[in-house]
UniProtKB/Swiss-Prot annotation:
Pfam families: Aldo_ket_red. Its EC number is 1.1.1.-. It is found in: Cytoplasm. Substrate binds at H97. GO terms for cellular component: cytoplasm. Belongs to the aldo/keto reductase family. GO terms for biological process: L-ascorbic acid biosynthetic process; methylglyoxal catabolic process. It catalyses: hydroxyacetone + NADP(+) = methylglyoxal + NADPH + H(+). It comes from the Bacteria. This is Methylglyoxal reductase DkgB.
Length: 267
């Protein structure tokens, strides 16, 4: 199954806040939900899905394995725990959230454990997140490019990550963009504002439409119903060549997510 182009992110949302966000999103027509073990909200997401009444087969659920669970003896048990919290027998996509710091657990070990989880039916697809080109090479060597559904990376108008994108594309690895709106910084951009005015759209719609137009999946989060609804309409917005050129010129390698002790050496 192809990764949906548009989904709901849940980073930094917990308890009642995430329950409300997920239920509202599902009510509005969202069907892809992105969570992670470290977000500490899988149980709340599971509850929201259960209460929404949306049938499981209509949903595309992604979770991510945290670094403490990367070893072959921990990965599958940790995923089973995630499934329990999410109240489901399987997830659609499981990602390695970050590569193991200092290569404590080798890429080969955790990718093969993840592939085993797929073979056991715990996850339909597997993938990676925050992987550089050398790390993608190792992941491909471990399980084959055909088994890597996506690389979820920070990607916004200010960090277009072109080297990683080009390399992934060349090897048939889809890109999912997180932090697409650059923590909201890009919403205040004059170039984006001009494009938004031209299309009678919001700045968020312009940025999300740009990313989807480039072929990336996006997973914006929001706690406000009007923003959830408005963001969804980005799927109907078509930018022209002039717009795309203007956004391409905003790239300035402005990376916002690079946790010390966790981040690899970026490309």
């Amino acid at each position: 199954m192809a990764i949906p182009a548009f989904g709901l992110g849940t980073f930094r949302l917990k308890d009642d806040v995430v329950i409300s966000s997920v239920k509202t999103a599902l009510e509005l027509g969202y069907r892809a939900i992105d969570t992670a073990q470290i977000y500490d909200n899988e149980a709340a997401v599971g509850l929201a899905i259960a209460e929404s009444g949306v049938p499981r087969h209509e949903l595309y659920i992604t979770t991510k394995i945290w670094i403490e669970n990367l070893s072959k003896d921990k990965l599958i048990p940790s995923l089973k725990e995630s499934l329990q919290k999410l109240r489901t027998d399987y997830v659609d996509l499981t990602l390695i959230h970050w590569p193991s710091p200092n290569d404590e657990v080798s890429v080969e070990e955790f990718m093969q454990a993840l592939l085993e989880a797929k073979k056991e039916g715990l996850t339909r697809e597997i993938g990676i997140s925050n992987f550089t080109i050398p790390l993608m090479e190792k992941a491909i060597a471990a399980v084959g490019a055909e088994n890597i559904a996506t690389n979820q990376i920070e990607l916004s108008p200010y960090l277009q990550n072109r080297k990683v994108v080009a390399w992934a594309k060349q090897h048939g690895i889809h890109i999912t963009s997180y932090m697409t709106l650059a923590y909201g910084k890009a919403l205040k951009d004059e170039v984006i504002a001009r494009i938004a005015a031209k299309h009678n759209a919001t700045p968020a719609q312009v940025i999300l439409a740009w990313a989807m137009g480039e072929g990336y999946s996006v997973i914006p989060s929001s706690t406000k119903r009007e923003n959830l609804e408005s963001n969804l309409k980005a799927q109907n917005l078509q930018l022209d060549a002039e717009d795309k050129k203007a956004i391409a010129a905003l790239d300035c390698n402005d990376r916002l997510v690079s946790p010390e002790g966790l981040a690899p050496e970026w490309d």
